[in-house]
């Protein structure tokens, strides 16, 4: 990540809580500097809502992300599949992604895992990484 970058170039699983009354999904996808393929078509939309139920109040939510390299990615919330896409790739239109594009290769098949709180307090517990075999 370069200095003064607003957000890291990433595939982001976004957690959002409800306000007690308004529907608001969690386990969404945000794609700063990246694109994905959904239902066979390249998707350039920055944030895509999942099909999850709203999680109101202070409750623990189980989130799982199944990532098969540059293949499929699935988001699960409380054990339910809520979002699925594939072929994560760098967006050549995004200036912050350009330094990461080597020999025209856009596919993202590796990277780092980060936990981040943007605007509200968040707690994480029992974080684990399990290889897909």
Protein language model regions, located:
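Carbohydrate-interacting regions of secretory-pathway proteins
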Residues: 1-133
